[in-house]
Amino acid sequence: MDSSAVITQISKEEARGPLRGKGDQKSAASQKPRSRGILHSLFCCVCRDDGEALPAHSGAPLLVEENGAIPKQTPVQYLLPEAKAQDSDKICVVIDLDETLVHSSFKPVNNADFIIPVEIDGVVHQVYVLKRPHVDEFLQRMGELFECVLFTASLAKYADPVADLLDKWGAFRARLFRESCVFHRGNYVKDLSRLGRDLRRVLILDNSPASYVFHPDNAVPVASWFDNMSDTELHDLLPFFEQLSRVDDVYSVLRQPRPGS
């Protein structure tokens, strides 16, 4: 595979600029030097340089004919299995990885929390991973409050071992990777309707608005994180998630103006 497509993330410049998805084609073509190719390949969740649409997924939503009847077809297969008994009454929270919980780089970092070996085209590369401040307490508490699902546009060969080391408490009931995204207008989008959960009881935490463009009313936005060890975003979000964990319908809260918005 092209070594420029394994990790999906955005740069600091892109985070400060107009809202774009991670790996947006225009920014990738005009701003990213070739040295970032491997990084873009591993983490990049949003764009495919060839512009090729993803193949149809078995979890695609049912099509509805003009008269409202559902055409006969194979029963839909959702991305998630049925919720476990302990999670049956909990809201499902989809949580992003790169620039939300961690930041990764192929450039050596002295204070890396994890070093992940990733094979690309027969060559093993070391990926240096920094944990966002307060991520441990955040995941521990989120796992108690919600049915948590890791959903990243990065490839599993990178994201799976990162999640193994990051999630000490088994907060993530499931992990979804790039192949579970929908390719839409140059971005990898996380289509929440394919999860198999009531959308009134689904949240998504992601630093990229392009990732939840299909369901913006389900989103709890989070600022992109790179290396600021004084960051308190995850800690500051916990009281809001505590509130959301007690509602019957997330729209009753998320469709209301939030302080500072």
From Swiss-Prot:
Every FCP1 homology domain range: 86-244
Alphabetized Pfam families for the sequence: NIF
Needed co-factor(s): Mg(2+)
TM stretches of this protein: none
Chain coiled-coil ranges: none
GO cellular component, one term: nucleoplasm
Protein name: Carboxy-terminal domain RNA polymerase II polypeptide A small phosphatase 1
